[in-house]
Swiss-Prot record:
<dbReference type="GO" id="GO:0005829">
    <property type="term" value="C:cytosol"/>
</dbReference>
<protein>
    <recommendedName>
        <fullName>UPF0434 protein RHE_CH03977</fullName>
    </recommendedName>
</protein>
<dbReference type="Pfam" id="PF03966">
    <property type="entry name" value="Trm112p"/>
</dbReference>
<comment type="similarity">
    <text>Belongs to the UPF0434 family.</text>
</comment>
<dbReference type="InterPro" id="IPR005651">
    <property type="entry name" value="Trm112-like"/>
</dbReference>
Amino acid sequence: MDEKLSRVDPKLLELLVCPLSKGRLSYDREHNELVSEKAQLAYPIRDGIPIMLVSEARRLDE
């Protein structure tokens, strides 16, 4: 994985929230996703861009 794409700016994490739960997100480096524990969803990051659509998110129980 490209080093540049495997990081998320901490300031971005402070601004972004889960669109479903409005809860905080954490970065999962292994899967390159933003995770909402509250909604149990993981949002993918593609080409360095977080895809904050519930329809694109992966359920954590999968």
